[in-house]
Swiss-Prot record:
Signal sequence annotation: 1-18
Pfam families reported in the protein's UniProt record: Glyco_hydro_56
Entry-listed glycosylation sites: 106, 141, 261, 337, 359
Region annotated Disordered, chain positions: 24-47
Descriptive protein name: Hyaluronidase conohyal-P1
Biased amino acid composition, Low complexity: 28-43
Molecular function as annotated in GO: hyalurononglucosaminidase activity
Enzyme Commission number: 3.2.1.35
């Protein structure tokens, strides 16, 4: 089964059809086109058209509460080229990090089940609250970053460990009720299959609703993808949710450094690992040009601001690896003492962060223009997960003299360009079909239809 979310003049309709959704052999995903068309993706070999290319290769996006503006302590973000919402709002036309996206099944710390507790028992399949809530934040002609942030449980069954282990345990109990004669191994297999399918239905449908309400946005989930130990385990697990990468039009891994005692080498390994995996799944599964924006922080747990050495890792390293930018996020808890925090933040921006961001974004833009004709991003030879060391060395220097400051970089072209220097227009073999504004999502029960009036359109 698959979900189709249709936006008509006055309603948002979530429909389940009996069509099977391919799991591994087809590269299909929604794309933010006009309000009357749909992107029909196929495999990477058959379809080269993707999302629109960016106007600059790298941005730093500000996603802090608007506390400083409300307290009349201005932060000079515009002086240094940050991207931010109008009036410094947390939710706006450039970025929306959404925590409340309607009903989700979850189990409280005391063991109380809400909305079924487990995805398998989720009883609110009309998703009307999700439509209503996302409708409140609907921005006309939204082309920014749309992020759904849900962290109570994870999409992959066996990644629910630690404090999330209760979801595995309760899923096995549920399976035992249905299959009392099964042994533990068999029950675990059933629990895993049922969990993965139900989690997919919920996550995919909520993502599809956001895409339908604001089709020009780059939609995805916070913290996806991430690493899971070894590279092999990471790839095997993340390949199990390839449906999410195919549907997402933005990838938002987390590179938060929560342990202030981590060494620089450990931090670099952590950051590069998560960014590498995002680059891999984007290349293998997502629509071409799907942006990657890791979430990063400016302060450690004890409120000490990170200095340039750390910024070179949390901002500079993702830039070298070819991401679209980095989102700088902070909780409202950081601003409980607003006057002190905002005053310190302004000093940090003016003396450390701002000049670094301004220089970094300009360097990446200059490199793109010099090496790639503005038709791609520069990727450092030692940080390209998509190329082997020999390939990186072979490409190095093809587009710039050896004495150039960009001699250690090569081009990763946007989807409509190709060649070592992104100098050749790539013919597109995609076809835009006039089928209304449709976004395909995950599975629902056959015949299930939801017809919900959009509060902002109706």
């Amino acid at each position: 089964m698959r979900v189709v979310v249709v936006v008509t003049g006055l309603v948002v309709v979530v429909v389940a059809t009996a069509l099977s959704l391919p799991d591994h052999d087809v590269k299909s995903a929604s794309s933010p086109l006009s309000s009357s068309s749909v992107y029909q993706g196929s495999s990477g070999d058959d379809c080269d058209e993707g999302l629109p290319p960016p106007d600059r290769p790298f941005y730093v996006v500000w996603n802090h509460p608007d506390t400083c503006k409300r307290n009349r302590i201005p932060l000079h973000l515009d002086h240094y080229g940050f991207i931010f919402n109008k009036n410094r709002l947390f939710l706006g036309e450039e970025i929306q990090t959404l925590y409340n996206t309607g009903l989700w099944p979850n189990i409280s710390e005391t063991g109380e089940f809400f909305n079924g507790g487990l995805p398998q028992l989720f009883t609110h399949h009309d998703y009307s609250e999700t439509v209503e809530i996302l409708g409140r934040y609907r921005t006309e002609n939204f082309t920014g970053l749309g992020i759904l942030d849900f962290e109570e449980w994870r999409a992959i069954y066996d990644t629910n460990f630690g404090i999330m282990r209760k979801y595995q345990d309760e899923s096995i109990k549920l399976a035992k009720q249905r299959y009392p004669s099964y042994n533990k191994k068999e029950l675990t297999m059933v629990a895993e299959q049922e969990w993965d399918q139900a989690a997919r239905e919920i996550m995919s449908t909520k993502l599809a609703i956001g895409q339908a309400l604001m089709p020009g946005g780059h939609w995805g989930y916070y913290g996806y993808p991430r690493t899971w130990g070894s590279k092999r385990n990471t790839q095997l697990r993340n390949n199990r949710i390839d449906w999410l990468w195919r549907q997402s039009t933005g990838l938002y891994p987390s590179i938060y450094i929560k342990d202030p005692n981590m060494t620089e080498s450990a931090i670099a390994e952590f950051v590069s690992g998560n960014v590498e995996e995002a680059v891999r799944v984007q290349d293998e599964f997502s629509p071409p040009n799907t942006p990657i924006y890791p979430y990063a922080m400016l302060q450690s747990g004890d409120h000490i601001f990170f200095q340039v050495d750390h910024l070179k890792i949390s901002l500079g390293l993702p830039a070298k690896m070819g991401t679209s930018g980095v989102i700088l996020w902070a909780s409202s808890n950081r601003y409980k003492n607003a006057t002190r925090q905002c005053s310190r933040m302004r000093v940090h921006i003016d003396n450390v962060l701002g000049p670094y961001v301004e220089n970094l974004t300009q360097v990446m833009a200059d490199c793109s223009t010099t090496l790639c004709g503005g038709h791609g991003r520069c990727v450092h030879n030692s940080h390209d997960v998509l190329l082997g060391e020999t390939d990186s060395q072979r490409l190095s220097g093809l587009c710039t003299p050896r004495h150039s400051r960009f001699r250690d970089y090569h081009c990763r072209c946007y989807s409509d360009w190709e060649g070592a220097c992104c100098q050749t227009v790539r013919p597109s073999r995609c076809h835009k079909q006039q089928q209304g504004n449709v976004h395909e999502g995950g599975d629902l029960q056959e015949g299930h239809v939801v017809n919900v009036v959009n509060p902002l359109i109706g």
